[in-house]
């Protein structure tokens, strides 16, 4: 049995062809080389597999032969099992000038022939996410540096050494191809995949913020002894309200109004009232309580329609609607009651400058509130440093949002959504990158989704999300049909930096 068993059959074109063999040796997503008689070697990928028996009808769904017919065929010397042939549909990965030549032989590729398809960078500049499935034969021909990099847990929970090509994500290319989406239904391996991505960022000491609403992203307990590295000095877990908060005197008037808006949408009249007051006086109060007293005093002067020693009525009566100001005060009072101003964010900023990953935990409500400040503050700090180069140093950062639809949902009108959208569009210029994980891809704001250059697609079955995948990725119709049936941990990776979709499996995580 050799590679000459595979030949191109039937009608072909420049996009796809069919290959026939008497031996069932190919699987979905395997890579093959068509040795085109006139155009040379053409790289292809298996997208469909079919089995045909020459003794049976092949053009109807209910084709079969009876036991009696089989016995008659055997009696005259026919072997039914030898009548089976295998047909494979191949999608062309190269760009041939002409249709593939019928009758061409087909063989399996070697590593050097296919390396460009998988890898855009070196191992030291890449994240080791998992393995590229169905590449065992190619793995045998790859250099030693690509071998024994990780372990894999199969669908039966058994751990294996690496036997297929490693999937490497070149994170240095995120300047050109920014932002990552990780999507999958419940039990698909989406959260596990997110854990592995964060582990890899920690290995490379990439400063990272993780908003963790499920309080599960802790990296202390090892999966296997002597597997992976010790992350204990590479991350910190901080809780909003206990370890993290907002230092009120550090806020400018734009940051403060964004925080107030988290407690309820502000009308134009409310914004005008706030801006009129802050246009006359910047935030000079030393605390949130002092600022509340300041607003309350102005409101009382406007309600009483008379001046006192402050002169607030004369200064603001023509500029500020008292009802709008009172609405702002009610929202600010609710903000004050969250205790968000009892701590500072200094621990966050210092950890990021040290190249650490910061896991931020809390209720979804508190995470949304704190994210509206922290995400904006980190982005502005990095932007000021890049633009001015004289500002205080602030590093390149990744911002990870688990359950991202709760931070930037398409049906939300929130400060956090607005900031995330801005980073999605402008962040790459400043070295600020997003990683959004969600069970509901279709629920995320569409402009943000469109800016994700790499998408990890785990098992998904809801029609709305499948439709979003059709629109926002380059998965083929065959791959989308397979999505509801993927095993836990199997994933399609749609990656702009290599211009291809790969079928992969997430590696065994170093931690639990």
Positions of the model-derived regions?
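Conserved catalytic network of the ASCE P-loop NTPase/AAA+ motor domain
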Residues: 174-175, 200-204, 351-352, 388-393, ...
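Conserved nucleotide-binding/hydrolysis micro-motifs of P-loop NTPases
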Residues: 51, 94-96, 214-218, 243-244, ...
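Hydrophobic "anchor" residues on beta-strands that sit immediately upstream
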Residues: 208, 398-399, 435
